[in-house]
From Swiss-Prot:
Class of enzymatic activity (EC top level): transferase
Protein source organism: Mesorhizobium japonicum (strain LMG 29417 / CECT 9101 / MAFF 303099) (Mesorhizobium loti (strain MAFF 303099))
Superkingdom of this protein's organism: Bacteria
Keywords carried by this UniProt record: Cell inner membrane, Cell membrane, Cobalamin biosynthesis, Magnesium, Membrane, Transferase, Transmembrane, Transmembrane helix
Role: Joins adenosylcobinamide-GDP and alpha-ribazole to generate adenosylcobalamin (Ado-cobalamin). Also synthesizes adenosylcobalamin 5'-phosphate from adenosylcobinamide-GDP and alpha-ribazole 5'-phosphate.
Location(s) in or outside the cell: Cell inner membrane
Cofactor: Mg(2+)
Annotated pathway: Cofactor biosynthesis; adenosylcobalamin biosynthesis; adenosylcobalamin from cob(II)yrinate a,c-diamide: step 7/7
Alphabetical GO biological process terms: cobalamin biosynthetic process
Gene (name only): cobS
Coiled coil: none
Membrane-traversing stretches: 41-61, 67-87, 119-139, 148-168, 179-199, 200-220, 237-257
The protein, known as: Adenosylcobinamide-GDP ribazoletransferase
A cellular component term, taken from the record's GO annotations: plasma membrane
Amino acid sequence: MKLPNLTLSPRQILDDVALCLVFFTRLPLPDLDFRGRGLAAAIWAAPVAGLLVGLIGAIVFATAERFGLAMGPAAALALVATVIATGCLHEDGLSDVADGFGGGKSRGRKLDIMRDSRIGAYGAMALALSLLIRWNVLSELVDPTQALFALVAAHAASRGVLGAFMHLLPPARSDGLSAGAGAVSLETAIAGAVLGAIPLLLLGAGGAIAALILLGLLFAAFHALCLNQIGGQTGDTIGALQQVSEIAVLLVASVALSS
């Protein structure tokens, strides 16, 4: 199989997908031998994990609607399902970044706050707004098919940008999760971005283009923000980027799917 400038054997593809499922979800998987391939090499497959998380949310949404629940409760249950599936991995990053960037005065202090497991006012507000916006968008969708398209597109595309972020920004600390993952190659970053962009076609041509433009603007802004605040990226900033990207795609989906 050949991805953009990235040739992998079938075994490597399976290894990379499995590694991303293990890292980005809490789904029960058997013990696997990844044969030395780390997250930096496998990050192109992150959209596959996102697609699966989106499918889980969509199935819960459709099941709830089938049993007569209104769109609001169905959307809430779908959100709960996706959060459980990921173990709040990205939400944790969002709250840590909000606390660190909002409360720290120096680069070192910001990184210290981000490492602290306690949540502050900035982090709590960021989490609340993230959940509120996502719930509101999903609750306004008119049927489970729209929920399926929106969730799959948002979860896949929001993970497709992560490899590029890791490629373009150096680790902000030498001992963090991101530093331990290693360097992401340009080929791997491109492969992940392309794979993550494909499900955006579920939003129609106009929706896909709008989502790509918005994702590009958010990516550039967050890239500049992280450089300014901490001089690079960490696992928390990667999680925060996923969250804001997911929200962006959901907002585009709410317009594209209703027109």
